[in-house]
UniProtKB/Swiss-Prot annotation:
InterPro entries: Cyt_P450, Cyt_P450_CS, Cyt_P450_E_grp-I, Cyt_P450_sf, Cytochrome_P450_Monoox. Its main location: endoplasmic reticulum. Liver; kidney. It comes from Oryctolagus cuniculus (Rabbit). The lineage of its organism: Eukaryota, Metazoa, Chordata, Craniata, Vertebrata. This is Cytochrome P450 4A6.
């Protein structure tokens, strides 16, 4: 080997050359990415050209309009100005079409377009690919497999379990309540609905409302809600690598771990129980099957059982959707009744006439409270638990007014905007339960608290039963009053929440 080959003075030059090549490659990749984003932006501009929208910045999109946190108010102004639909630009090369017209909703919900993976994929580390995130034939197989878990015969015994969970919460409130102070109800209602899911879907013994470990799961779900919403709107956090290295990414990872620890514990306890109980027919003779039993005994069309990954995804999905959405619904229903005492009073009279002292409620009672049901539905109209859902068009679509979209466009079905659309609901901000009176006519897709079409909420009957039980048992024990100093600040997350909580004053009735 020559001396010159070992000469260290030549190394800096070689290193410099490598750095130059790396720099050029990096610049080339950057230019290619910029060109890709530019071409995608031009495609979006052409795709959405039939749909007017407010002016937007070439890079920041409409983000400036939503900086003050009044997203829902801004959106409702758009609803009044732009008929049926309006594009929203998140940033330079990302946009989706907001729709809020029942005819538009009917068209999209009648199709089999997949969920908009651009945003929904951020949920996968938390809830996996269960019924919420699956698409196509796999989704269809899982939906058909899970449907028996929501049959009326299975739902009937749940009413007593729901009532037990509600009474535990109300007993707690009775100890906390005073005439001069208010109570933040969302946290307690979240624990109650988690308790209900654990008892009904997973046959949990005892009450998670009395278990401090359950608080960490509720906190993790709240954190994941906020982190998902924040990530969707952060251009730098679209990259999984960058997000994992960020403080928010690390917090999300820890919250996912806490959520998974909870669901894994539930699954392992049931597997151990089934090993002792034996085969399906033996279990069925001993007790009723619940949601988790259906999953563990289920067979896919090819005869195989669910994988552990699929099993946890369905449990995580139902654990979240089955408690957080109903907690949102119940909390906002209570707020709506607190701010409309005349309707609250009429509901209470109806319930007292049906239940007497309210000591017990049964399946048969649920269809015998028409006015209370009307008020529940009106509260769900004003405060839909799920503000919107997204679809990515798998084929071109033409709407009834002749406007069209090509394949690939993301469409956001804004349930909140639909429910507040003055062309659909006259005086939409006024609490009026009478449009929901039995026999009243309305567009089939004007009211969508549980979405619609083949991908509607599989647990909607379970949820409605729980809402009725919670409202009925609460109104016979408490009068609900608003706290004028703490008006809720609505925030659209995965579910509709309040940034400052939902504070109510409670007055004991008995």
């Amino acid at each position: 080997m020559s001396v010159s080959a070992l000469n260290p003075t030549r190394l800096p030059g070689s290193l410099s050359g490598l750095l130059q090549v790396a720099g050029l490659l990096g610049l080339l990749l950057l230019l290619l990415k910029a060109a890709q984003l530019y071409l995608h932006r031009q495609w979006l501009l052409r795709a959405l050209q039939q749909f007017p929208c407010p002016p937007f910045h070439w890079l920041l999109g409409h983000s400036r309009e939503f900086q003050n946190g009044h997203e829902l108010q801004v959106m409702l102004k758009w609803v009044e100005k732009f008929p049926s639909a309006c594009p929203r630009w998140l940033w330079g090369s990302r946009a989706h079409l907001l729709i809020y017209d029942p005819d538009y909703m009917k068209v999209i919900l009648g199709r089999s377009d997949p969920k908009a993976q651009g945003s929904y994929r951020f949920l996968a580390p938390w809830i996996g690919y269960g019924l919420l995130l699956l698409n196509g034939q796999t989704w269809f197989q899982h939906r058909r497999m899970l449907t028996p878990a929501f049959h009326y015969d299975i739902l009937k015994p749940y009413v007593g379990l729901m009532a037990d969970s509600v009474q535990i919460m109300l007993d707690k409130w009775e100890q906390l309540v005073s005439q001069d102070s208010s109570l933040e109800v969302f946290q307690d209602i979240s624990l109650m609905t988690l308790d209900t899911i654990m008892k009904c879907a997973f046959s949990h013994q005892g009450s998670v409302q009395l278990d401090r470990n359950s608080q960490s799961y509720i906190q993790a779900v709240g954190d994941l809600n906020n982190l998902f919403f924040s990530r969707v709107r952060n251009v730098f956090h679209q990259s999984d690598t960058i997000y994992r290295l960020s403080p928010e990414g690390r917090l999300s990872h820890r919250a996912c771990q806490l959520a998974h620890e909870h669901t894994d514990r539930v699954i392992q306890q049931r597997k151990a129980q089934l090993q002792q109980e034996g085969e399906l027919e033996k279990v069925r003779r001993k007790r009723r099957l619940d949601f988790l039993d259906v999953l563990l005994f289920a067979k896919m069309e090819n005869g195989s059982s669910l994988s552990d990954q699929d099993l946890r995804a369905e449990v995580d999905t139902f654990m979240f959707e089955g408690h957080d959405t109903t907690a949102s619904g119940i909390s906002w229903i209570f707020y709506a009744l607190a701010t409309h005492p005349e309707h609250q009073h009429r509901c209470r009279e109806e319930i007292q006439g049906l239940l007497g002292d309210g000591a017990s409620i049964t399946w048969e009672h649920l269809d015998q409270m028409p006015y209370t049901t009307m008020c529940i539905k009106e509260a769900l109209r004003l405060y839909p638990p799920v503000p919107g859902v997204g679809r990515q068009l798998s084929s071109p679509v033409t709407f009834p007014d002749g406007r069209s979209l090509p394949k690939g466009v993301i469409v956001t079905l804004s349930i909140y905007a639909l429910h507040h659309n003055p062309k659909v609901w006259p005086n939409p901000e006024v609490f009026d339960p009478f449009p929901f009176a039995p026999g009243s006519a309305r567009h089939s897709h004007a009211f969508l608290p549980f979405s619609g079409g083949p991908r509607n909420c599989i647990g909607k009957q379970f949820a409605m039963n729980e809402l009725k039980v919670a409202v009925a048992l609460t109104l016979v024990r408490f009068e609900l009053l608003p706290d004028p100093k703490r008006v809720p600040d609505q925030k659209p997350r995965l579910v509709l929440k309040s940034s400052n909580g939902i504070h109510l004053r409670l007055r004991k009735l008995r």
